[in-house]
Amino acid sequence: MNRRQVLAALAAIPLLPEAFPANAQAPQKPAAFDPSVVRQIARQLASKPYQAPDTKLPSALADLDYDAYRAIRFNPERALWRGDQLPFQVQFFHRGLFYKNAVTIYEVANGKAQQIRYRSDDFSFGATPAPPPDADLGFAGFRIHAPINKPDYYDEVSVFLGATYFRAVAKGQHYGLSARGLSIDTGQSGGEEFPLFTAFWLERPAPEASSMVVHALLDSKSVAGAYRFTIRPGDTTVFDVEMALYPRADLEHAGLSPMTSMFFFGPNDPSDAADFRPEVHDSDGLAIFNGRGEQLWRPLANPRDLQISAFADLNPRGIGLMQRERQFQAYQDLESRFGLRPSLWAEPIGDWGEGVVQLIEIPTKEEVHDNIAAFWTPKTPLKAKGEHIYTYRLHWGPDTPKPSSLARFSRTGISVRGDHRLFVLDITGDILKSVDAGAVRGVVSADKGEIRNVVTQPNPETGGWRLSFDLTPETPAAELRASLWGGDKALSEVWVYRWTL
């Protein structure tokens, strides 16, 4: 939907009779706002047929290449709340390149919402001709700045840009993987539907606030939705996410708390080409803390063919795409600094019922493409004409919010040895420092193929243990499980892996 359609929907809400007039050029008075407003708008939208957004732009902006788009910069002196001595500032992105959809953005202060007007003189355009001063092109998205690393400097801590994508960093980190508001039909043969955030409401923070609140309106062919993000930057940057979905049609393959990342190569899946870097990835594994209390670790891969894995569960406790390898030596990349990229852990609040954690691994020949997706799909489709409410917490940072006492699999290595594959798994954790070495054993299984030569031994280089075994394949793919035990006590999480030719 376009900006005028958003404004028309807003004006149709009885609570806001004169709010958000459809005439975008007319001066606007602040309109009453409370958290229920966005849900009302979403519910109203869902009751009507979807209207696709108008993506028209002046030709000078519609045909930008990557470098020309990057040259368009927002003037930080014009940032929202600049000079107000507040703990957050907001800068805006111009439309162009991949980001042709306009989003309407409001500031909320003292219970009133006021649209933030687009002005071309807030931007520098490089070699691209600037739009005329009276142009009303809208924004593509925004980024949030806060003094996360130094008390006197506002670093970029989060970005909302493109479809329903957003991402964040914690203190001392660089951007890496992204989250999305919702995914629909991801990995399905009929193709994916991409919902859009079409409007945002930014609550003005108090002078001593440690968090910022962002409301978002989602719209798509199949669903409308309302979101509330409470964002707390820090050593771990935390998003509290409250969402209400109003499907126009039954959603059989809705992805909740979707994440998208990149895995190009690593020790379990090395590069076919010569590369000075041992590893290249934004995330190296999927972590699951399931409803049965089991903790799973699934190393990521860059497969030859599309791979879709499903982990059935009831009321999951946590799901994350993690970057466990933090050492520079593992990457050797001074520019990309993959070891400083965040892990993302999604913690459901309340019961999510039955469903599956979906992991999608897409073949890629370039590191510039996100080829990993993970999300939760409810077993029961989200029915049309209903309200479906979910709450969860996102943790962007170096680790899960509550590290387990169980030892972790820190590295997965695989070698080809004739007709079999040698797996070498390193495991680290404080629990292993006081273990009875004579009682340690590895438990390994495969759904297809033969497992032989299971060996466990201390690893003096890591202070942990090493578990190795041979797999003799019988088919082009096998599902593997491994864990470390001391007698009848589990010492480690459960390593799960799909081996493919």
From Swiss-Prot:
Q: In which pathway does it act?
A: Glycan metabolism; osmoregulated periplasmic glucan (OPG) biosynthesis
The entry lists its GO molecular-function terms as:
carbohydrate binding; catalytic activity
Which one GO biological process term can you cite for this protein?
A: beta-glucan biosynthetic process
Question: Could you tell me which SUPFAM superfamilies the record lists for this protein?
Answer: E set domains, Galactose mutarotase-like
The residues the entry assigns to the signal sequence are 1-24
What are the entry keywords?
Answer: Periplasm, Signal
Instruction: Show the stretches that span the lipid bilayer.
Output: none
The record's family statement is: Belongs to the OpgD/OpgG family.
Its recorded name reads Glucans biosynthesis protein G
Organism name: Rhodopseudomonas palustris (strain BisA53)
